[in-house]
Amino acid sequence: MTHYIQGQWHAGKGHDVASINPANAQTIWTGKTATAEQVNAAVDAARAAQFDWFMLGFDARLAIVEAYRSQLEANKAELAETIAQETGKPQWETATEVGAMIGKIALSAAAYNKRTGTEANDTPAGRAVIRHKPHGVVAVFGPYNFPGHLPNGHIVPALLAGNTVIFKPSELTPKVAELMVSLWDKAGLPAGVLNLVQGEVDTGKALASHPQLDGLFFTGSSRTGHFLHQQYAGHPGKILALEMGGNNPLIIKGVQDIKAAVHDILQSAYISSGQRCTCARRLYVEQGEQGNALIAMLAAAVKQIKVGPWNAQPQPFMGSMISETAAKGMVAAQTNLQNLGGVSLVELTHLEAGTGLVSPGLIDVTAIDVLPDEEYFGPLLQLVRYSDFDQAIKLANQTRYGLSAGLLADSREDYDYFLARIRAGIVNWNKQITGASGAAPFGGVGASGNHRASAFYAADYCAYPVASVEADAVSLPATLSPGLSL
């Protein structure tokens, strides 16, 4: 049970791969990668199934997607535990992820009807009708940080629109993908409508470059996303939706309740061990006594964050990072900032060799003239002190990314000023910047995406509009155009 093609499970024909629990280094899944021939078979299966799937109609497709929702409900404990073991996230957090997967069904159905349904109006020229059709065969590339929820956010709207899908998950979370697809199978999805190919870079390249793809929906790193954008640049007929990362700023200004502000900072920077694309990476705090008090409370709170394995009791706030390699990468990022002049207020440390367990870090980088514009994808928050609000906003905008940004401030006028000037696709006020609504679009500008917002707007990139002018019969106009005679 490694690859799912044409409604059947197949062993891979490539090289051996394994999935490792990053909290204890135990192997929890093994398999073989898909070869280019198996990728071809998956695309062929999706192509063969696509028209019949579209012709079922929306209501019939929705019924099957609803059956999948029922499977998620019935298996939510197993799915949450699988996500926890494979990602290292605490059980409380993976239960929330499964809940989001379940909620995605109703939200996607509502989005389909609101954004890509059918609308007809009578005009003097005839009946004007707007309809939407699926692109055809699309690939979904999933990330490791939300291995259920994020690919689910592409797959569900794609299927509702009438597309067929080849799903290529992160090579770090194959077990979650296998379980997800098995639930689709139990839901009665017709053969070929959803196919799963597991693998690493070679598998991904074989799928992304396949000539029979009509589109690709990607969530992941900016580096990979930019590579895909270059690859698709000469193919205007293919739809490409990119959701990438961010170097996200959070500004604090004039907040009286500093304990509440510290809570929102912790939730913004350290949830999921800092492995959310919307996590705060840069924190801007005013110079002065109030700012000093906030930083002192923040540093103390960061030191108290509980870190532990996914199944620890009592449950930790932070689990493991995705791998030991990722953990070591965060230590290296911190060292780089220290060498540039940063001063660690709370040092990030690798807690246990062979695992992805790290403690959270807080580093004052005010003395660094030019901060590296990098997405350090982990629990390391960079602190900058500022003297005036315009300076803070200017510094916040000094990034090639533009995913999320936030302001904690008691003044509505300050928020309006900030909202008008900040450059990001998600802008929150007095809320953690990792909080996003599935009933709203999700996406960014700059290096964070290619203007294909997901979540509620995923329906937009899953279908294309068809405009028609229609009449029940051919009819001769009352007056012919000049120069015509009949």
Swiss-Prot record:
<feature type="active site">
    <location>
        <position position="277"/>
    </location>
</feature>
<dbReference type="GO" id="GO:0019544">
    <property type="term" value="P:arginine catabolic process to glutamate"/>
</dbReference>
<dbReference type="GO" id="GO:0019545">
    <property type="term" value="P:arginine catabolic process to succinate"/>
</dbReference>
<protein>
    <recommendedName>
        <fullName>N-succinylglutamate 5-semialdehyde dehydrogenase</fullName>
        <ecNumber>1.2.1.71</ecNumber>
    </recommendedName>
</protein>
<dbReference type="InterPro" id="IPR016162">
    <property type="entry name" value="Ald_DH_N"/>
</dbReference>
<dbReference type="InterPro" id="IPR029510">
    <property type="entry name" value="Ald_DH_CS_GLU"/>
</dbReference>
<keyword id="KW-0560">Oxidoreductase</keyword>
<feature type="active site">
    <location>
        <position position="243"/>
    </location>
</feature>
<comment type="similarity">
    <text>Belongs to the aldehyde dehydrogenase family. AstD subfamily.</text>
</comment>
<dbReference type="InterPro" id="IPR017649">
    <property type="entry name" value="SuccinylGlu_semiald_DH_AstD"/>
</dbReference>
<dbReference type="InterPro" id="IPR015590">
    <property type="entry name" value="Aldehyde_DH_dom"/>
</dbReference>
<dbReference type="InterPro" id="IPR016160">
    <property type="entry name" value="Ald_DH_CS_CYS"/>
</dbReference>
<dbReference type="Pfam" id="PF00171">
    <property type="entry name" value="Aldedh"/>
</dbReference>
<dbReference type="InterPro" id="IPR016163">
    <property type="entry name" value="Ald_DH_C"/>
</dbReference>
<keyword id="KW-0520">NAD</keyword>
<comment type="pathway">
    <text>Amino-acid degradation; L-arginine degradation via AST pathway; L-glutamate and succinate from L-arginine: step 4/5.</text>
</comment>
<dbReference type="InterPro" id="IPR016161">
    <property type="entry name" value="Ald_DH/histidinol_DH"/>
</dbReference>
<comment type="function">
    <text>Catalyzes the NAD-dependent reduction of succinylglutamate semialdehyde into succinylglutamate.</text>
</comment>
<keyword id="KW-0056">Arginine metabolism</keyword>
<dbReference type="GO" id="GO:0043824">
    <property type="term" value="F:succinylglutamate-semialdehyde dehydrogenase activity"/>
</dbReference>
<feature type="binding site">
    <location>
        <begin position="220"/>
        <end position="225"/>
    </location>
    <ligand>
        <name>NAD(+)</name>
    </ligand>
</feature>
